């Protein structure tokens, strides 16, 4: 069937066979299908949708467009975690050592930041000397020896997704649920883990803005994973407000270490404990209550922090900075952002905060941009807090000539009010193959 006919079929609301999806996806990877044809087909998917079975087949075709990682040399159940992204989303650096300290093997591939959201690999590389590009042999050997490793995603994984994502980004088809689900799950299936916990963020700082849409996406991804024989669960977490107080690479590492030392912010600690609990449940470590107790215990006895240091040391990192934060690269300058009036912070748009941190140099506006590891923002006041005029809302770190533009961006997402806004939950729901449990 010609690509023209396949575009027309989806435009008219038809359902594709696996063979047709292979023609589209593999043709795009090989260059037989052009960008403009793929863009037309993806817009047809955006407007007409896909059945769950069709999306599961698309995911598998995308996964098989590149390397399929075989984790069988690592014994036991391997559990992975994926976040759909957010501002100040530093949970991976906390939960991976917690779960590994409880005896579960973690062989995780993570990404870099793009747009207003940060990436785990960038954060890890702010620890001097840390290597995130390991060979497969080094990766497996480290996981077998110490129980965990987090590395950058291989260029060879889900090749179709890389091309399709870049095209979606410039054709207004990013927020299409079947295309988001197949993008995420193709990488997860190709990465080889037995069980996957998805952290589906929702709100202003996330790509999906409503709880209802986030649940729809989570159900579809759980269905895809189950269809392919993986254990999958998804938590719907709030991203209207950044987790914790720090946004920026080394700043987020410091805050993550504080959680592992038992002195982190309450919101970040709670979300990390819930994520770790569900990963342990997927790994058959016990009931939710037993797994929660295990996660709390490895923070309390210091073994989770020790496991984190062990991982950084194995990957060449200078672990002294994890104990003494003054050894991190220091910012060139700092700036206090002051409240312009009295009142409650009714809105503090997380996407605007993330964009402000990018302007400071903590993130990338385009692929390949250099990062300032010391740049970022520390929040002193968050949504729901009362502030007095002249009080510090946040401290900016970076190069002085970037402060004005970042402050303008930050303030554009700030709304004051006379009434304290209602509190939003940290976690909205847990989605499994058995259904949706609302919190």
Where are the regions that the model predicts?
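Well-ordered secondary-structure scaffolds
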Residues: 5, 17, 28, 68-69, ...
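Alpha-helix C-terminal capping segments
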Residues: 47, 93-105, 187-192, 224-228, ...
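General beta-strand structural signal in soluble alpha/beta enzymes
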Residues: 106-110, 132-135, 150-153, 197-200, ...
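A glycine-rich helix N-cap at a beta->alpha junction
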Residues: 123-149, 219-225, 229
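Phosphate/diphosphate-binding glycine-rich loops and adjacent basic-rich segments that engage nucleotide
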Residues: 144-193
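Gly-rich Lys/Arg/Thr-decorated short loops/hinges at beta-loop-alpha junctions or inter-strand turns
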Residues: 3-5, 120, 161-169, 202
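Acidic, glycine/proline-rich low-complexity segments that act as flexible tails and inter-domain linkers
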Residues: 1-88, 307-318, 433-434, 439
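Glycine/serine-rich anion-binding loops at beta->alpha junctions
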Residues: 77-100, 104-116
């Amino acid at each position: 069937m010609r690509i023209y006919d396949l575009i027309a079929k989806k435009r008219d609301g038809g359902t594709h066979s696996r063979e047709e999806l292979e023609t589209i996806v593999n043709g795009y990877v090989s260059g037989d299908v052009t960008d403009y044809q793929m863009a037309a087909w993806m817009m047809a998917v955006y407007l007409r949708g896909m059945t769950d079975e069709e999306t599961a087949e698309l995911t598998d075709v995308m996964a098989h467009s590149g390397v399929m990682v075989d984790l069988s040399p690592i014994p036991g159940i391997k559990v992975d975690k994926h976040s759909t992204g957010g501002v100040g989303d530093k949970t991976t650096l906390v939960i991976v050592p917690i779960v590994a300290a409880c005896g579960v093997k973690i062989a995780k591939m993570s990404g870099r930041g793009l747009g207003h959201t940060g990436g785990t690999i960038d954060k890890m590389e702010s620890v001097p000397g840390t290597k995130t590009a390991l060979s497969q042999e080094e990766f497996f050997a480290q996981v077998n020896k110490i129980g965990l490793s987090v590395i950058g995603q291989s260029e060879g994984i889900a090749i179709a997704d890389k091309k399709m994502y870049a095209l979606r980004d410039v054709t207004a088809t990013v927020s299409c649920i079947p295309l988001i689900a197949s993008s995420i799950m193709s990488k997860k299936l190709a990465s080889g883990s037995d069980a996957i916990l998805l952290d589906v963020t929702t709100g202003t700082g996330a790509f999906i803005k409503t709880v209802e849409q986030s649940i729809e996406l989570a159900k579809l991804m759980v269905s895809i994973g189950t269809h392919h024989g993986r254990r999958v669960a998804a938590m719907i977490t709030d991203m209207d407000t950044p987790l914790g107080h720090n946004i920026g690479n080394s700043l987020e590492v410091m805050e993550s270490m504080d959680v592992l030392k038992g002195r982190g912010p309450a919101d970040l600690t709670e979300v990390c404990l819930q994520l770790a609990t569900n990963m342990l449940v997927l790994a058959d470590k016990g009931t939710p209550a037993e797994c929660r107790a295990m996660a709390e215990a490895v923070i309390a006895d210091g073994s989770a922090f020790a496991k984190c240091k062990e991982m950084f040391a194995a990957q060449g990192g200078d672990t002294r900075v994890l104990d003494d934060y003054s050894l991190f690269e220091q910012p060139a300058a700092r700036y206090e952002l002051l409240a312009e009036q009295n009142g409650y912070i009714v809105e503090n748009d997380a996407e605007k905060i993330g964009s402000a941190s990018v302007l400071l140099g903590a993130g990338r506006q385009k692929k390949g941009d250099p990062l300032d590891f010391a740049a970022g923002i520390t929040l002193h006041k968050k949504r729901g807090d009362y502030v007095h005029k002249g009080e510090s809302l946040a401290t900016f770190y970076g190069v002085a000539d970037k402060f004005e533009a970042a402050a303008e961006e930050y303030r554009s997402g700030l709304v004051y009010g006379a009434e304290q806004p209602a509190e939003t939950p940290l976690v909205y729901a847990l989605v499994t193959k058995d259904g949706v449990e609302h919190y």
